[in-house]
Amino acid sequence: MIDTFHTKVLQAKNKDEVREMASLTKMMTAIVSLELAEEMRLDIRTTYFKVSYKACTTIGTTANTVDGQVMTIWELLHGLMLPSGNDAAMVLAENFSNRLILNANRSAKEEEKVIEVPKCSFYPFVK
């Protein structure tokens, strides 16, 4: 339990257990993709990205993308968040490239300052 007003941890279960970031990376990918689309003045409903072979063969949970398929950012965000599609995350990352990594790391660094949880590190979010 976190006191968001004072940004303090009040109670924690298994607080020293190291956990994978898993879907947190997908949430960060979605947030940063939306920020980048806005910054670049891209309409997420009419801007299309092409699915690469690398993206559609990414291991893990999938949005069932197909090599060569063309999808809007909106569709990719749905594929990213609803079935937790690693393939959709890869398409967004490939198309936003280094900007996505830089913005994700910047956001993670900012969050780390706000959420002062011992032994917790969000930064660097992407190496």
Task: Briefly describe each language-model feature range.
Residues 1-127:
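Active-site-adjacent loops and short helices of periplasmic peptidoglycan-processing enzymes
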